[in-house]
Regions:
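Extended, histidine- and acidic-residue-enriched regions that form the cofactor-binding/catalytic faces
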Residues: 1-114, 120-274
């Protein structure tokens, strides 16, 4: 009997079962994160661990609709390289690696792919991977960041003003999922240089995009107030993220793939490749 209808983990299927999953047109989820410093109190796997945990819970709830790939655990991290343990991947390497994954699953016949990001600096890269996948295959590829789905709930319970890195948000999620790994006695509050239009970590909520070497402005590796993190908050925002992604999966699975129409009235040079 095939496990395709009940198994949500891509790498747990056999190749004959993969044929069944393709026939079901399961949506493929690719979690992405990073391996980088997260202060004195959190492990360096924060971004990939949190993102993968959210994606796996989505899979557990709707196993007949999705397959979750093993995550991409490394990302664009040179700005954190002054802190031991951080692994940096150059943007072109990351994009090409991710594109090889999405094109592989498209080649096998999966028509819908969702890249879920867990690391702010990867956002423009996964956007490009998704766009290139659509242009270079017959599948549709979407890109999102899981924490967009929890911010509404988090804003109701947050006690800190800055949400950025190793902060109240990430600390709360990690406390909920694996509290034994969090060293809360070492949690601190720390902030970057902030102006009206730009900050040292302008990846969100600023008019100007800018990210400085973190070794220039922090000795802790924290941006925000980690001391406000609690497992109770983490449970609330984890549920919000999972529920949001489940709703997104349902919408994307129903999204049509229409046939392209060529509007030219004169011959085109179809041999040109980009």
């Amino acid at each position: 009997m095939s496990n395709a209808a009940t198994e949500y983990r891509y790498n747990r299927l056999t190749w004959p079962e993969m044929n069944d999953a393709i026939g079901m047109q399961k949506l493929i989820i690719l979690p992405t994160g990073s391996t980088e410093q997260h202060g004195h109190h959190l492990p360096i796997d924060v971004d990939v661990f949190l993102c993968e945990s959210v994606c796996h819970e989505v899979g557990r709830r709707i196993p007949d609709k999705v397959l979750v790939l093993p995550p991409i655990s490394y990302g664009l991290n040179r700005h954190h390289i002054d802190f031991p343990g951080t692994i940096h991947i150059e943007p072109d390497v990351f994009i090409n690696f991710g594109l090889n994954i999405t094109k592989s699953v498209a080649y096998h016949g999966f028509q819908k792919i969702l890249i879920v990001n867990g690391h702010g600096s990867n956002a423009p890269l996964i956007d490009l991977i998704a766009r290139k996948t659509v242009l270079e295959t017959e599948s549709l590829c979407f890109a999102t960041t899981y924490f967009w789905f929890l911010m509404e709930e988090f804003n109701k319970i947050r006690e800190s003003n800055v949400i950025a890195h190793a902060d109240e948000f990430e600390t709360s999620l990690y406390l909920h999922l694996a509290g034994d790994r969090v060293q809360m006695e070492k949690a601190v509050e720390d902030n970057d240089r902030m102006g009206k239009y730009v900050s040292s970590d302008s990846t969100m909520n600023y008019f100007v995009r800018f990210n400085d070497y973190w070794g220039r402005w922090t000795k802790t590796g924290v941006h925000g107030d980690a001391t406000k993190g609690t497992a109770e908050k983490g449970k609330i925002i984890f549920e919000a993220a999972v529920n949001g992604l489940v709703n997104l999966v349902n919408e994307l699975r129903a999204w049509p793939i229409d046939k392209r129409a060529d509007m030219h009235t004169h011959p085109i040079q179809s041999q040109i490749q980009w």
